[in-house]
Structure formats: C-alpha cells, structure tokens
Curated annotation (Swiss-Prot):
PANTHER family: 40S RIBOSOMAL PROTEIN S15A. It comes from the Bacteria. The lineage of its organism: Bacteria, Bacillati, Bacillota, Clostridia, Eubacteriales. InterPro entries: Ribosomal_uS8, Ribosomal_uS8_CS, Ribosomal_uS8_sf. One of its GO terms (cellular component) is ribonucleoprotein complex. This is Small ribosomal subunit protein uS8. It comes from Ruminiclostridium cellulolyticum (strain ATCC 35319 / DSM 5812 / JCM 6584 / H10). One of its GO terms (biological process) is translation. Transmembrane segments: none annotated. It holds the Pfam family Ribosomal_S8. Keywords: Ribonucleoprotein, Ribosomal protein, RNA-binding, rRNA-binding. Belongs to the universal ribosomal protein uS8 family. Part of the 30S ribosomal subunit. Contacts proteins S5 and S12. One of the primary rRNA binding proteins, it binds directly to 16S rRNA central domain where it helps coordinate assembly of the platform of the 30S subunit.
Length: 131
C-alpha cells in the first residue's frame, strides 16, 4: 500500500492506538520515523520502542505510556503536510501550550524538539505538535 504522508500515518496510528487503549502499535520503519519515536521517548510520551526486522522494511513497535489509565499523549497533530509545507525561522519557532507540549522540527542538524532548536539557534520545517 502506498502511503502519501508517512509521518501523518505514524501519528495517526499512535493517536488511534492510544484512544483504543492498546499497549503497543506497529509502524513501518524508516529513519525519519525512528528519529520521531526517539524524540517521543526522550520527552516521556512513550515507554519505549523497538525495531523488528521482517526481512523487508522493518517495523517499529512503539509501546505507549499511560498514567492512571489515561494516555500520556493528550494530542498529536501533523503541521507541515506534503501539500502545504510549514517552515519557521529560529525566531518564529512555535511553543505548544505555552511550553507544556513539544513541536517536532526537522532542521539541517536533524530532527529535534522546538526547545533544542532554540538552544541551537536554528529553524526548520515544523513536522508536528505533541501535547
């Protein structure tokens, strides 16, 4: 199956699995998705993730995190889409919920959060908001 927007597919799978109270969700693997999963892990939005080799593309198994039977990820939204790219300079980087959430940014130095991009002093493409 051809997926037009792989990042939106990943975020939707995580959102749906959280709504259905699933323990984990399987996502087709790629370097970009691995980087996004790593950011979600570092920021405490997921328990962990592992890469499962299937002889082809591979699969990322993301284990979701719950707090009192409530999903830790309250909201997850794709911002920059294939039809409408959204870029932000170092001075225009968005804050999600006044700093309580994170923005995932694709920069020239790799995928990082908005906080890290501010420290590095670089802008980039705003991939998603997570809160």
């Amino acid at each position: 199956m051809q997926i037009t927007d792989a990042i939106a597919d990943m975020l939707t799978r995580i959102r749906n699995a959280g709504s259905a109270k699933h323990e984990s969700v399987d996502i087709p693997a790629s370097n970009l998705k691995r980087s996004i999963a790593n950011i979600l892990l570092e920021e405490g939005y997921i328990k962990n993730f592992e890469e499962i080799s299937d002889g082809k593309q591979g699969v990322l198994r993301v284990n979701l995190k719950y707090n009192n039977k409530q999903n830790v990820i309250t909201g997850i939204k794709r911002i920059s889409k294939p039809g409408l790219r959204v870029y932000a300079g170092k001075d225009q980087l968005p804050k999600v919920l006044g700093g309580l959430g994170i923005a995932v940014i694709s920069t020239s130095k790799g995928i990082m959060t908005d906080k890290k991009a501010r420290v590095e002093g670089i802008g980039g493409e705003v991939l998603a908001f997570v809160w």
